[in-house]
Amino acid sequence: MEQKAVFDKVVKILSPYAKDKDALARVSETTNILDELKVNSARLVDVVLEFEDEFGIEIADDDVDGISTIGDCVQLISQKAA
């Protein structure tokens, strides 16, 4: 799957969890999920579960610790889905 397609799906999955809709409108790979989009850290588990379902992958807890930006998500998902 192309990086752009993964990026678009990641943003779509994050959309309902993002409290800052203005930041969501100008999202990029460097956008911080917790700080800029204001996704509640407790909801990050739900986001990861949706990533796993959408892309047919498994994401380990250690991998989740390395996710802070949308680009981190795209890179991790691309690696796992390859």
Residues covered by each model-derived region:
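Thiotemplate assembly-line natural product biosynthesis machinery
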Residues: 1-23
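Phosphopantetheine carrier-protein modules
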Residues: 18-38, 58-68
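C-terminal structural segments of small proteins and small subunits
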Residues: 71-80
